[in-house]
Amino acid sequence: MKTQTKVMGGHVLLTVFTLCMLCSAVRAQLSPDIYAKSCPNLLQIVRDQVKIALKAEIRMAASLIRLHFHDCFVNGCDASVLLDGTNSEKLAIPNVNSVRGFEVIDTIKAAVENACPGVVSCADILTLAARDSVYLSGGPQWRVALGRKDGLVANQSSANNLPSPFEPLDAIIAKFAAVGLNVTDVVALSGAHTFGQAKCDLFSNRLFNFTGAGTPDSTLETTLLSDLQTVCPIGGNGNKTAPLDRNSTDAFDNNYFKNLLEGKGLLSSDQILFSSDLAVNTTKRLVEAYSRSQYLFFRDFTCSMIRMGSLVNGASGEVRTNCRVIN
């Protein structure tokens, strides 16, 4: 059979049949229709609230994707990243004063609870919000399998081991492999850096003294380097931000990969996908392919999001009333 796609208003809609053929199996306890009777308006409620959030701050789309990523990489997609407390994942080094969007999830949860009290998990709400953030920014849409439970504990130590923008490519690939994701997932999910912002603290090491020899990262395009040195001077405010993709700051597209071919990746972990020695036999060809075909990127990104969203720890857990605390 032929796979089918529809292009609608700039969005790519991949059919369920196509996704089933292209992506690895979703965990058995997850189903797109699990709330069809218990919360029939769930999808519309979440999308409406995400629209409101993006209208208030367009950057929130990228923030919700990142929040979902940081959740799924620690104990699976169980909304543990949303929990408050002394061992909160929010306080882990990669997350503190960095990961954002918690208030948006609170607002969505309140709207869902008003319609369907005690039915829908925070983990499912976060997964749907991430999907809608992509779609509403011009990216692909896909059916989200639902039925995740909310975790009962946070894991700050594991959150401290999230993939870092300062790590070499082999370390990043290994961390993805440790949770069951492959090299294609590394590149496709990195494509989420096609929108959003990054703080100077996350890339200023590339601008002046990258190797300890007093020189910048040689893979960084010179005009971009000069601009970034102005934005993030030595001794400057590390909390200032720069767009991850200057070509289309708030749009979900394949410009991120085109940037990498020109040495315009903002983070070291972005540019090494194309420019590092290890990339030659691992990630470089995918970067080149995605730069040529937005459809191919959208297809693989969708599959990677489905795989990542299927990282769950069995059926244990609960449906939290408040996403910040266990019941």
UniProtKB/Swiss-Prot annotation:
Signal sequence, start to end: 1-28
Residues that, per the record, bind heme b: 193
EC number(s) reported in the record: 1.11.1.7
Intrachain disulfide bonds: 39-116, 72-77, 122-323, 200-232
UniProt binding sites for Ca(2+) 1: 71, 74, 76, 78, 80
UniProt site positions, description: Transition state stabilizer: 66
Superkingdom to which the source organism belongs: Eukaryota
Cofactor(s) needed by this chain: Ca(2+); heme b
Cofactor note as given: Binds 2 calcium ions per subunit.
Catalytic site: 70 (proton acceptor)
InterPro entries registered for this protein in UniProt: Haem_peroxidase (IPR002016), Haem_peroxidase_sf (IPR010255), Peroxidase_pln (IPR000823), Peroxidases_AS (IPR019794), Peroxidases_heam-ligand_BS (IPR019793), Secretory_peroxidase (IPR033905)
Glycan attachment sites: 155, 182, 209, 239, 247, 281
Function: Removal of H(2)O(2), oxidation of toxic reductants, biosynthesis and degradation of lignin, suberization, auxin catabolism, response to environmental stresses such as wounding, pathogen attack and oxidative stress. These functions might be dependent on each isozyme/isoform in each plant tissue.
Name of the featured protein: Peroxidase N
Organism, as annotated: Armoracia rusticana
